[in-house]
Protein backbone atom coordinates (compact mmCIF):
# COMPACT_ATOMS: atom_id res chain seq x y z
CA UNK A 1 0.00 0.00 0.00
CA UNK A 2 2.68 2.54 -1.02
CA UNK A 3 0.58 4.46 -3.60
CA UNK A 4 1.63 8.09 -3.25
CA UNK A 5 -0.44 11.23 -3.62
CA UNK A 6 1.16 14.69 -3.84
CA UNK A 7 -0.11 17.38 -1.49
CA UNK A 8 -0.75 20.53 -3.52
CA UNK A 9 -3.68 22.09 -1.66
CA UNK A 10 -4.57 21.90 2.05
CA UNK A 11 -7.55 23.13 4.04
CA UNK A 12 -6.73 24.13 7.62
CA UNK A 13 -9.44 24.79 10.23
CA UNK A 14 -8.48 24.16 13.84
CA UNK A 15 -9.78 25.09 17.28
CA UNK A 16 -6.55 24.06 19.00
CA UNK A 17 -3.93 26.25 17.34
CA UNK A 18 -0.91 24.49 18.91
CA UNK A 19 1.71 23.95 16.22
CA UNK A 20 -0.51 25.09 13.36
CA UNK A 21 1.60 28.12 12.39
CA UNK A 22 4.78 26.06 12.05
CA UNK A 23 2.92 23.33 10.17
CA UNK A 24 1.32 25.82 7.79
CA UNK A 25 4.69 27.49 7.22
CA UNK A 26 6.23 24.12 6.39
CA UNK A 27 3.43 23.29 3.95
CA UNK A 28 3.63 26.69 2.28
CA UNK A 29 7.40 26.43 1.96
CA UNK A 30 6.85 23.20 0.04
CA UNK A 31 4.51 24.85 -2.42
CA UNK A 32 1.21 23.78 -0.86
CA UNK A 33 -1.70 26.19 -1.43
CA UNK A 34 -3.47 27.02 1.84
CA UNK A 35 -7.24 27.33 2.33
CA UNK A 36 -8.57 28.22 5.75
CA UNK A 37 -11.53 29.47 7.76
CA UNK A 38 -12.28 32.11 10.38
CA UNK A 39 -9.80 32.42 13.21
CA UNK A 40 -7.33 30.00 11.66
CA UNK A 41 -7.20 32.03 8.44
CA UNK A 42 -6.71 35.28 10.36
CA UNK A 43 -3.89 33.79 12.42
CA UNK A 44 -2.07 32.49 9.33
CA UNK A 45 -2.51 35.80 7.51
CA UNK A 46 -1.13 37.69 10.52
CA UNK A 47 1.99 35.53 10.26
CA UNK A 48 2.42 36.56 6.63
CA UNK A 49 1.33 33.28 5.08
CA UNK A 50 -0.47 33.29 1.71
CA UNK A 51 -3.89 31.92 2.63
CA UNK A 52 -7.27 31.92 0.87
CA UNK A 53 -10.39 32.23 2.98
CA UNK A 54 -12.84 29.41 2.28
CA UNK A 55 -15.61 31.98 1.85
CA UNK A 56 -13.58 33.65 -0.92
CA UNK A 57 -12.98 30.27 -2.56
CA UNK A 58 -16.64 29.21 -2.44
CA UNK A 59 -18.08 32.66 -3.10
CA UNK A 60 -20.39 32.06 -0.16
CA UNK A 61 -19.89 33.95 3.12
CA UNK A 62 -19.74 32.47 6.59
CA UNK A 63 -23.13 32.91 8.22
CA UNK A 64 -25.21 32.28 11.32
CA UNK A 65 -22.39 33.26 13.69
CA UNK A 66 -20.03 30.79 12.06
CA UNK A 67 -22.43 27.85 12.10
CA UNK A 68 -22.14 27.56 8.32
CA UNK A 69 -18.60 27.89 6.97
CA UNK A 70 -17.42 24.81 5.13
CA UNK A 71 -20.69 23.04 4.32
CA UNK A 72 -20.43 23.75 0.60
CA UNK A 73 -20.08 21.55 -2.54
CA UNK A 74 -16.83 23.27 -3.54
CA UNK A 75 -15.34 22.20 -0.21
CA UNK A 76 -16.75 18.70 0.06
CA UNK A 77 -16.51 18.07 -3.66
CA UNK A 78 -12.82 18.93 -3.44
CA UNK A 79 -12.39 16.50 -0.58
CA UNK A 80 -14.63 13.65 -1.76
CA UNK A 81 -13.82 13.85 -5.46
CA UNK A 82 -12.17 10.64 -6.67
CA UNK A 83 -9.04 11.42 -8.65
CA UNK A 84 -9.25 9.96 -12.15
CA UNK A 85 -12.98 9.30 -11.83
CA UNK A 86 -14.66 12.57 -10.87
CA UNK A 87 -12.24 14.95 -12.60
CA UNK A 88 -14.67 16.04 -15.33
CA UNK A 89 -17.54 16.91 -12.99
CA UNK A 90 -15.14 18.73 -10.67
CA UNK A 91 -13.77 20.80 -13.56
CA UNK A 92 -17.30 21.54 -14.81
CA UNK A 93 -18.26 23.02 -11.42
CA UNK A 94 -14.90 24.70 -10.77
CA UNK A 95 -14.13 22.43 -7.84
CA UNK A 96 -10.44 22.32 -6.98
CA UNK A 97 -9.12 19.08 -5.46
CA UNK A 98 -8.16 19.37 -1.78
CA UNK A 99 -5.34 16.96 -0.97
CA UNK A 100 -5.04 17.49 2.78
CA UNK A 101 -7.53 18.47 5.48
CA UNK A 102 -6.18 19.66 8.84
CA UNK A 103 -8.98 19.87 11.39
CA UNK A 104 -9.51 19.57 15.11
CA UNK A 105 -12.88 20.11 16.66
CA UNK A 106 -14.63 22.60 18.92
CA UNK A 107 -13.61 21.98 22.57
CA UNK A 108 -16.86 20.35 23.68
CA UNK A 109 -15.35 18.38 26.59
CA UNK A 110 -13.56 21.43 27.99
CA UNK A 111 -16.71 23.53 27.66
CA UNK A 112 -19.06 21.18 29.52
CA UNK A 113 -16.41 20.61 32.22
CA UNK A 114 -16.53 24.29 33.18
CA UNK A 115 -18.51 25.14 36.26
CA UNK A 116 -21.82 26.73 35.36
CA UNK A 117 -21.77 25.62 31.73
CA UNK A 118 -25.23 26.19 30.26
CA UNK A 119 -26.97 23.97 27.76
CA UNK A 120 -26.70 26.80 25.24
CA UNK A 121 -22.92 26.96 25.69
CA UNK A 122 -22.69 23.21 25.22
CA UNK A 123 -24.82 23.29 22.07
CA UNK A 124 -22.74 26.06 20.49
CA UNK A 125 -19.62 23.95 21.03
CA UNK A 126 -20.95 21.02 19.03
CA UNK A 127 -18.88 21.08 15.87
CA UNK A 128 -20.75 20.30 12.65
CA UNK A 129 -18.56 21.38 9.77
CA UNK A 130 -15.39 19.99 11.33
CA UNK A 131 -16.55 16.38 11.77
CA UNK A 132 -18.14 16.50 8.33
CA UNK A 133 -14.84 17.44 6.71
CA UNK A 134 -12.98 14.89 8.81
CA UNK A 135 -15.30 12.09 7.77
CA UNK A 136 -15.27 13.16 4.13
CA UNK A 137 -11.48 13.20 4.02
CA UNK A 138 -11.19 9.91 5.90
CA UNK A 139 -13.65 8.27 3.54
CA UNK A 140 -11.59 9.43 0.57
CA UNK A 141 -8.23 8.55 2.16
CA UNK A 142 -7.23 6.95 -1.13
CA UNK A 143 -6.68 10.49 -2.40
CA UNK A 144 -6.77 12.78 0.66
CA UNK A 145 -4.78 13.01 3.90
CA UNK A 146 -6.80 13.90 7.00
CA UNK A 147 -4.83 15.30 9.96
CA UNK A 148 -6.59 15.57 13.33
CA UNK A 149 -3.64 15.42 15.75
CA UNK A 150 -0.95 18.06 16.06
CA UNK A 151 1.44 15.32 17.17
CA UNK A 152 1.44 14.09 13.54
CA UNK A 153 2.57 17.39 12.00
CA UNK A 154 6.31 16.75 12.12
CA UNK A 155 6.07 13.19 10.80
CA UNK A 156 3.94 14.34 7.87
CA UNK A 157 6.46 16.98 6.83
CA UNK A 158 9.30 14.46 7.10
CA UNK A 159 7.44 12.00 4.89
CA UNK A 160 6.62 14.67 2.34
CA UNK A 161 10.31 15.59 2.18
CA UNK A 162 11.24 11.95 1.71
CA UNK A 163 8.65 11.45 -1.06
CA UNK A 164 8.91 14.63 -3.14
CA UNK A 165 5.89 16.28 -1.49
CA UNK A 166 3.74 13.14 -1.40
CA UNK A 167 2.25 10.89 1.27
CA UNK A 168 1.88 7.14 0.93
CA UNK A 169 -1.41 5.29 1.02
CA UNK A 170 -0.24 3.54 4.19
CA UNK A 171 0.10 6.90 5.91
CA UNK A 172 -3.21 8.21 4.59
CA UNK A 173 -4.95 5.04 5.76
CA UNK A 174 -3.42 5.36 9.24
CA UNK A 175 -4.47 9.01 9.40
CA UNK A 176 -8.00 8.01 8.36
CA UNK A 177 -8.22 5.52 11.21
CA UNK A 178 -7.16 8.24 13.66
CA UNK A 179 -9.80 10.51 12.14
CA UNK A 180 -12.64 8.04 12.62
CA UNK A 181 -11.43 7.36 16.17
CA UNK A 182 -11.44 11.12 16.77
CA UNK A 183 -14.99 11.70 15.54
CA UNK A 184 -16.26 8.60 17.35
CA UNK A 185 -14.82 9.88 20.63
CA UNK A 186 -16.23 13.35 19.97
CA UNK A 187 -19.74 12.08 19.28
CA UNK A 188 -19.51 9.81 22.32
CA UNK A 189 -18.76 12.78 24.57
CA UNK A 190 -21.79 14.62 23.22
CA UNK A 191 -24.05 11.57 23.55
CA UNK A 192 -22.88 10.95 27.13
CA UNK A 193 -23.43 14.59 28.07
CA UNK A 194 -26.96 14.76 26.72
CA UNK A 195 -27.73 11.23 27.88
CA UNK A 196 -26.98 12.26 31.46
CA UNK A 197 -29.70 14.92 31.18
CA UNK A 198 -32.51 12.43 30.55
CA UNK A 199 -35.37 13.52 32.85
CA UNK A 200 -37.27 11.35 35.30
CA UNK A 201 -40.21 10.81 32.94
CA UNK A 202 -37.97 8.52 30.90
CA UNK A 203 -37.95 6.12 33.82
CA UNK A 204 -34.83 7.08 35.77
CA UNK A 205 -34.69 8.88 39.08
CA UNK A 206 -33.45 12.46 38.94
CA UNK A 207 -30.32 11.41 40.80
CA UNK A 208 -29.48 8.59 38.40
CA UNK A 209 -30.36 10.63 35.33
CA UNK A 210 -27.91 13.33 36.36
CA UNK A 211 -25.00 10.97 36.88
CA UNK A 212 -25.18 8.06 34.47
CA UNK A 213 -26.17 8.46 30.80
CA UNK A 214 -28.78 6.10 29.41
CA UNK A 215 -26.23 4.94 26.82
CA UNK A 216 -22.62 4.75 27.96
CA UNK A 217 -20.02 5.36 25.26
CA UNK A 218 -16.42 4.70 26.23
CA UNK A 219 -13.25 5.50 24.32
CA UNK A 220 -9.86 4.14 25.31
CA UNK A 221 -6.57 4.19 23.42
CA UNK A 222 -4.35 1.14 23.19
CA UNK A 223 -1.10 1.81 25.02
CA UNK A 224 0.50 -1.59 24.60
CA UNK A 225 -0.04 -5.20 23.60
CA UNK A 226 0.72 -7.86 26.20
CA UNK A 227 2.48 -11.19 25.79
CA UNK A 228 -0.64 -12.67 27.40
CA UNK A 229 -3.35 -11.82 29.89
CA UNK A 230 -4.03 -12.92 33.44
CA UNK A 231 -3.12 -16.42 32.28
CA UNK A 232 -0.90 -17.55 29.41
CA UNK A 233 -3.82 -18.83 27.30
CA UNK A 234 -5.48 -15.38 27.32
CA UNK A 235 -4.58 -12.61 24.87
CA UNK A 236 -4.49 -9.07 26.28
CA UNK A 237 -3.75 -5.40 25.72
CA UNK A 238 -3.66 -2.28 27.91
CA UNK A 239 -5.95 0.61 26.99
CA UNK A 240 -5.89 4.03 28.62
CA UNK A 241 -8.15 7.05 28.77
CA UNK A 242 -7.21 10.31 27.09
CA UNK A 243 -6.39 13.33 29.23
CA UNK A 244 -6.09 11.51 32.56
CA UNK A 245 -5.72 14.22 35.20
CA UNK A 246 -4.41 12.14 38.12
CA UNK A 247 -1.10 10.35 38.52
CA UNK A 248 -1.77 6.70 37.76
CA UNK A 249 -0.33 3.52 36.34
CA UNK A 250 -1.86 4.59 33.01
CA UNK A 251 0.13 7.84 32.93
CA UNK A 252 3.30 6.51 34.57
CA UNK A 253 6.61 6.46 32.72
CA UNK A 254 8.59 3.23 32.78
CA UNK A 255 12.21 4.21 33.29
CA UNK A 256 13.66 0.74 33.65
CA UNK A 257 12.97 -2.94 33.10
CA UNK A 258 11.20 -5.24 30.68
CA UNK A 259 7.63 -4.74 29.49
CA UNK A 260 4.89 -4.74 32.09
CA UNK A 261 2.62 -7.77 32.17
CA UNK A 262 -1.16 -7.77 32.62
CA UNK A 263 -0.80 -8.78 36.27
CA UNK A 264 1.99 -6.24 36.81
CA UNK A 265 -0.31 -3.42 35.72
CA UNK A 266 -3.25 -4.61 37.83
CA UNK A 267 -1.10 -5.02 40.95
CA UNK A 268 0.76 -1.75 40.41
CA UNK A 269 -2.56 0.06 40.20
CA UNK A 270 -3.65 -1.51 43.50
CA UNK A 271 -0.40 -0.52 45.21
CA UNK A 272 -0.36 3.04 43.90
CA UNK A 273 -3.99 3.74 44.76
CA UNK A 274 -3.42 2.50 48.30
CA UNK A 275 -0.27 4.55 48.92
CA UNK A 276 -2.13 7.68 47.76
CA UNK A 277 -4.25 7.50 50.92
CA UNK A 278 -1.32 8.57 53.11
CA UNK A 279 0.23 12.00 53.60
CA UNK A 280 3.25 10.80 55.58
CA UNK A 281 6.09 8.91 53.84
CA UNK A 282 4.49 5.55 53.08
CA UNK A 283 5.23 2.19 51.51
CA UNK A 284 2.70 -0.34 50.20
CA UNK A 285 3.67 -3.86 49.11
CA UNK A 286 1.06 -5.69 47.03
CA UNK A 287 0.75 -9.31 45.92
CA UNK A 288 -2.13 -10.53 43.77
CA UNK A 289 -3.96 -7.20 44.12
CA UNK A 290 -3.92 -7.31 47.94
CA UNK A 291 -1.66 -5.29 50.24
CA UNK A 292 0.58 -7.68 52.16
CA UNK A 293 2.46 -4.96 54.02
CA UNK A 294 1.86 -1.24 54.60
CA UNK A 295 3.62 1.28 56.81
CA UNK A 296 4.12 5.01 57.28
CA UNK A 297 7.15 6.57 58.92
CA UNK A 298 9.48 9.56 58.82
CA UNK A 299 11.25 8.18 55.73
CA UNK A 300 10.38 5.79 52.92
CA UNK A 301 13.33 3.59 53.90
CA UNK A 302 11.89 2.97 57.35
CA UNK A 303 8.37 2.68 55.89
CA UNK A 304 9.62 -0.01 53.49
CA UNK A 305 11.47 -1.86 56.24
CA UNK A 306 8.34 -1.94 58.41
CA UNK A 307 5.99 -2.84 55.55
CA UNK A 308 8.25 -5.72 54.53
CA UNK A 309 8.23 -7.14 58.07
CA UNK A 310 4.47 -7.68 57.92
CA UNK A 311 4.76 -10.61 55.52
CA UNK A 312 8.20 -11.21 53.95
CA UNK A 313 7.03 -14.44 52.32
CA UNK A 314 4.24 -12.74 50.38
CA UNK A 315 6.41 -9.71 49.58
CA UNK A 316 8.62 -11.93 47.39
CA UNK A 317 7.83 -11.07 43.77
CA UNK A 318 5.53 -8.26 44.85
CA UNK A 319 4.86 -4.70 43.76
CA UNK A 320 6.19 -1.83 45.89
CA UNK A 321 4.70 1.67 45.85
CA UNK A 322 5.94 4.84 47.54
CA UNK A 323 4.48 8.33 47.87
CA UNK A 324 7.91 9.98 47.92
CA UNK A 325 10.90 9.89 45.56
CA UNK A 326 12.74 6.58 45.45
CA UNK A 327 16.18 7.28 46.91
CA UNK A 328 19.40 5.29 46.65
CA UNK A 329 19.32 3.98 50.21
CA UNK A 330 15.80 2.59 49.83
CA UNK A 331 16.57 1.14 46.39
CA UNK A 332 19.60 -0.65 47.83
CA UNK A 333 17.54 -2.05 50.71
CA UNK A 334 14.98 -3.48 48.29
CA UNK A 335 17.46 -4.97 45.84
CA UNK A 336 19.55 -6.51 48.63
CA UNK A 337 16.58 -8.00 50.42
CA UNK A 338 14.03 -9.34 47.97
CA UNK A 339 12.91 -10.13 44.45
CA UNK A 340 10.54 -7.39 43.29
CA UNK A 341 8.52 -7.15 40.07
CA UNK A 342 7.72 -3.41 40.02
CA UNK A 343 8.65 -0.31 42.00
CA UNK A 344 6.48 2.77 41.44
CA UNK A 345 7.08 6.20 42.99
CA UNK A 346 6.44 9.85 42.10
CA UNK A 347 10.08 10.05 40.98
CA UNK A 348 13.38 8.21 41.31
CA UNK A 349 16.82 9.69 41.91
CA UNK A 350 19.60 9.01 39.44
CA UNK A 351 21.55 7.12 42.10
CA UNK A 352 18.52 4.95 42.87
CA UNK A 353 18.18 4.02 39.19
CA UNK A 354 21.85 3.04 39.00
CA UNK A 355 21.23 0.62 41.85
CA UNK A 356 18.01 -0.89 40.48
CA UNK A 357 19.63 -1.22 37.03
CA UNK A 358 21.80 -3.98 38.50
CA UNK A 359 18.65 -6.13 38.43
CA UNK A 360 17.55 -6.07 34.79
CA UNK A 361 14.15 -7.62 35.48
CA UNK A 362 13.11 -4.95 37.99
CA UNK A 363 10.62 -2.56 36.44
CA UNK A 364 10.75 1.01 37.77
CA UNK A 365 7.91 3.43 37.08
CA UNK A 366 7.62 7.12 37.92
CA UNK A 367 4.17 8.66 38.01
CA UNK A 368 4.65 12.22 39.29
CA UNK A 369 3.12 13.69 42.42
CA UNK A 370 -0.64 13.82 42.90
CA UNK A 371 -2.22 17.01 44.18
CA UNK A 372 -5.64 15.49 44.69
CA UNK A 373 -7.82 12.51 43.85
CA UNK A 374 -10.03 12.98 40.81
CA UNK A 375 -13.64 11.71 40.92
CA UNK A 376 -14.51 9.30 38.16
CA UNK A 377 -16.17 5.99 37.37
CA UNK A 378 -15.20 2.42 38.15
CA UNK A 379 -16.23 -0.43 35.86
CA UNK A 380 -16.69 -4.14 36.45
CA UNK A 381 -17.36 -6.39 33.49
CA UNK A 382 -19.99 -9.09 33.91
CA UNK A 383 -21.07 -11.51 31.21
CA UNK A 384 -23.28 -9.45 28.92
CA UNK A 385 -23.01 -6.21 30.84
CA UNK A 386 -21.04 -3.59 32.71
CA UNK A 387 -21.42 -2.47 36.32
CA UNK A 388 -20.67 1.23 36.72
CA UNK A 389 -20.17 3.14 39.96
CA UNK A 390 -18.38 6.15 41.38
CA UNK A 391 -14.76 5.63 42.41
CA UNK A 392 -14.50 4.86 46.11
CA UNK A 393 -12.75 8.04 47.21
CA UNK A 394 -14.58 8.22 50.53
CA UNK A 395 -12.56 8.33 53.74
CA UNK A 396 -13.71 9.34 57.20
CA UNK A 397 -11.89 11.93 59.25
CA UNK A 398 -11.14 11.62 62.94
CA UNK A 399 -13.96 14.06 63.69
CA UNK A 400 -16.48 11.76 61.99
CA UNK A 401 -15.67 8.67 64.04
CA UNK A 402 -18.11 7.38 66.67
CA UNK A 403 -16.83 5.58 69.75
CA UNK A 404 -19.58 3.10 70.71
CA UNK A 405 -17.79 1.13 73.44
CA UNK A 406 -17.51 1.94 77.11
CA UNK A 407 -13.77 2.41 76.84
CA UNK A 408 -12.36 5.28 74.81
CA UNK A 409 -9.39 4.51 72.54
CA UNK A 410 -6.01 5.89 73.51
CA UNK A 411 -4.33 8.38 71.19
CA UNK A 412 -2.08 5.63 69.78
CA UNK A 413 -5.01 3.27 69.30
CA UNK A 414 -6.88 5.99 67.46
CA UNK A 415 -3.92 6.64 65.16
CA UNK A 416 -3.54 2.94 64.48
CA UNK A 417 -7.26 2.55 63.88
CA UNK A 418 -7.31 5.30 61.26
CA UNK A 419 -4.18 3.85 59.67
CA UNK A 420 -5.51 0.32 59.32
CA UNK A 421 -8.91 1.63 58.21
CA UNK A 422 -7.20 3.24 55.21
CA UNK A 423 -5.45 -0.04 54.43
CA UNK A 424 -8.62 -2.13 54.78
CA UNK A 425 -10.22 -0.08 51.99
CA UNK A 426 -7.77 -1.71 49.54
CA UNK A 427 -7.93 -5.30 50.80
CA UNK A 428 -10.29 -7.75 49.09
CA UNK A 429 -13.43 -8.46 51.11
CA UNK A 430 -13.89 -9.85 53.61
CA UNK A 431 -10.99 -7.71 54.81
CA UNK A 432 -9.40 -7.62 58.25
CA UNK A 433 -6.26 -5.60 59.00
CA UNK A 434 -4.25 -5.59 62.23
CA UNK A 435 -1.96 -2.60 62.78
CA UNK A 436 0.29 -1.26 65.49
CA UNK A 437 2.41 1.88 65.55
CA UNK A 438 1.64 2.81 61.95
CA UNK A 439 2.44 -0.55 60.36
CA UNK A 440 0.36 -3.54 59.43
CA UNK A 441 1.12 -6.64 61.47
CA UNK A 442 -1.43 -9.00 59.95
CA UNK A 443 -3.80 -8.91 56.96
CA UNK A 444 -6.66 -11.33 56.32
CA UNK A 445 -8.05 -10.97 52.80
CA UNK A 446 -10.74 -12.41 50.59
CA UNK A 447 -12.31 -14.90 52.97
CA UNK A 448 -15.95 -15.86 52.68
CA UNK A 449 -16.50 -15.34 56.42
CA UNK A 450 -15.22 -12.34 58.34
CA UNK A 451 -14.16 -14.36 61.36
CA UNK A 452 -11.75 -16.41 59.22
CA UNK A 453 -10.18 -13.23 57.84
CA UNK A 454 -9.64 -12.17 61.46
CA UNK A 455 -8.10 -15.54 62.31
CA UNK A 456 -5.78 -15.41 59.28
CA UNK A 457 -4.60 -11.91 60.21
CA UNK A 458 -3.73 -13.22 63.66
CA UNK A 459 -1.94 -16.26 62.25
CA UNK A 460 0.16 -14.10 59.91
CA UNK A 461 1.19 -11.83 62.78
CA UNK A 462 2.16 -14.85 64.90
CA UNK A 463 4.14 -16.40 62.03
CA UNK A 464 6.28 -13.26 61.77
CA UNK A 465 6.64 -12.86 65.53
CA UNK A 466 4.80 -9.53 65.52
CA UNK A 467 3.20 -8.44 68.78
CA UNK A 468 -0.58 -8.19 68.39
CA UNK A 469 -1.28 -7.17 71.97
CA UNK A 470 -2.40 -3.55 72.02
CA UNK A 471 -3.00 -3.43 68.26
CA UNK A 472 -5.94 -2.02 66.31
CA UNK A 473 -8.12 -4.06 63.97
CA UNK A 474 -10.03 -2.72 60.96
CA UNK A 475 -12.90 -4.49 59.21
CA UNK A 476 -14.10 -3.26 55.82
CA UNK A 477 -17.73 -4.06 56.71
CA UNK A 478 -19.73 -4.66 59.87
CA UNK A 479 -19.41 -7.74 62.04
CA UNK A 480 -22.59 -9.80 61.70
CA UNK A 481 -21.76 -11.74 64.87
CA UNK A 482 -19.57 -11.31 67.91
CA UNK A 483 -17.22 -14.15 66.90
CA UNK A 484 -14.88 -11.79 65.02
CA UNK A 485 -14.46 -9.69 68.16
CA UNK A 486 -13.84 -12.78 70.28
CA UNK A 487 -11.16 -13.93 67.82
CA UNK A 488 -9.50 -10.51 67.91
CA UNK A 489 -9.56 -10.39 71.70
CA UNK A 490 -7.98 -13.84 71.87
CA UNK A 491 -4.83 -12.56 70.14
CA UNK A 492 -4.67 -9.26 72.05
CA UNK A 493 -6.38 -6.66 69.84
CA UNK A 494 -7.35 -3.67 71.99
CA UNK A 495 -9.19 -1.43 69.50
CA UNK A 496 -11.58 -2.23 66.63
CA UNK A 497 -12.69 0.11 63.85
CA UNK A 498 -15.59 -0.94 61.62
CA UNK A 499 -18.57 0.60 59.79
CA UNK A 500 -21.28 -0.68 62.11
CA UNK A 501 -24.81 -1.19 60.85
CA UNK A 502 -25.47 -4.83 61.71
CA UNK A 503 -28.76 -5.87 63.27
CA UNK A 504 -26.55 -7.41 65.96
CA UNK A 505 -24.50 -4.28 66.65
CA UNK A 506 -25.58 -4.39 70.29
CA UNK A 507 -24.18 -7.92 70.68
CA UNK A 508 -20.94 -6.95 68.93
CA UNK A 509 -20.51 -3.85 71.10
CA UNK A 510 -21.25 -5.92 74.20
CA UNK A 511 -18.50 -8.35 73.18
CA UNK A 512 -16.07 -5.45 72.85
CA UNK A 513 -17.02 -4.20 76.30
CA UNK A 514 -16.60 -7.68 77.80
CA UNK A 515 -13.04 -7.81 76.46
CA UNK A 516 -12.22 -4.18 77.32
CA UNK A 517 -11.84 -3.35 73.63
CA UNK A 518 -12.43 0.19 72.37
CA UNK A 519 -14.79 0.08 69.38
CA UNK A 520 -15.13 2.79 66.74
CA UNK A 521 -17.85 3.07 64.09
CA UNK A 522 -17.10 4.83 60.81
CA UNK A 523 -20.60 4.60 59.30
CA UNK A 524 -18.87 3.98 55.95
CA UNK A 525 -18.29 0.60 54.32
CA UNK A 526 -15.43 -0.29 51.95
CA UNK A 527 -16.31 -3.55 50.22
CA UNK A 528 -13.81 -4.50 47.53
CA UNK A 529 -14.55 -7.40 45.19
From Swiss-Prot:
MGS-like domain sequence ranges: 1-148
Family assignment from sequence similarity: Belongs to the PurH family.
GO CC annotation terms, alphabetical: cytosol
PROSITE patterns registered for this protein in UniProt: MGS
Domain comment as written in the entry: The IMP cyclohydrolase activity resides in the N-terminal region.
S-S bridge residues: none
Gene (UniProt): purH
Pathway: Purine metabolism; IMP biosynthesis via de novo pathway; 5-formamido-1-(5-phospho-D-ribosyl)imidazole-4-carboxamide from 5-amino-1-(5-phospho-D-ribosyl)imidazole-4-carboxamide (10-formyl THF route): step 1/1; Purine metabolism; IMP biosynthesis via de novo pathway; IMP from 5-formamido-1-(5-phospho-D-ribosyl)imidazole-4-carboxamide: step 1/1
EC annotation from Swiss-Prot or TrEMBL: 2.1.2.3, 3.5.4.10
Protein name: Bifunctional purine biosynthesis protein PurH
GO molecular function: IMP cyclohydrolase activity; phosphoribosylaminoimidazolecarboxamide formyltransferase activity
SMART domains: AICARFT_IMPCHas, MGS
GO biological process assignments: 'de novo' IMP biosynthetic process
Organism the protein comes from: Salmonella newport (strain SL254)
Catalytic activity: (6R)-10-formyltetrahydrofolate + 5-amino-1-(5-phospho-beta-D-ribosyl)imidazole-4-carboxamide = 5-formamido-1-(5-phospho-D-ribosyl)imidazole-4-carboxamide + (6S)-5,6,7,8-tetrahydrofolate; IMP + H2O = 5-formamido-1-(5-phospho-D-ribosyl)imidazole-4-carboxamide
NCBIfam families: PRK00881.1 (NF002049), purH (TIGR00355)
InterPro entries cross-referenced by the UniProt entry: AICAR_Tfase_dup_dom_sf, Cytidine_deaminase-like, MGS-like_dom, MGS-like_dom_sf, PurH-like
Coiled-coil intervals, chain numbering: none
Keywords assigned by UniProt, alphabetized: Hydrolase, Multifunctional enzyme, Purine biosynthesis, Transferase
Amino acid sequence: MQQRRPVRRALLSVSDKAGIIEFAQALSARGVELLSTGGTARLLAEKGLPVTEVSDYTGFPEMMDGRVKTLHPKVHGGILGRRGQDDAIMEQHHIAPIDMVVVNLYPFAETVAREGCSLEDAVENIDIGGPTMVRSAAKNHKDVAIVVKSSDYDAIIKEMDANEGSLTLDTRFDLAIKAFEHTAAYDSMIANYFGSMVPAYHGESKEAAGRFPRTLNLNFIKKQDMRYGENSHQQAAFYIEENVKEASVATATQVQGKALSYNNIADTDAALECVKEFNEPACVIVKHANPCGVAVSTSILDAYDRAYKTDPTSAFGGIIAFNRELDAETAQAIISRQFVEVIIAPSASGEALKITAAKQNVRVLTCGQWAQRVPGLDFKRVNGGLLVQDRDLGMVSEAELRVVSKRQPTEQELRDALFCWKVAKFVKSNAIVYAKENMTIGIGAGQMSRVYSAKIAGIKAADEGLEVKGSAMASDAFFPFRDGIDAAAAVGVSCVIQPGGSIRDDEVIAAADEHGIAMIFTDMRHFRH
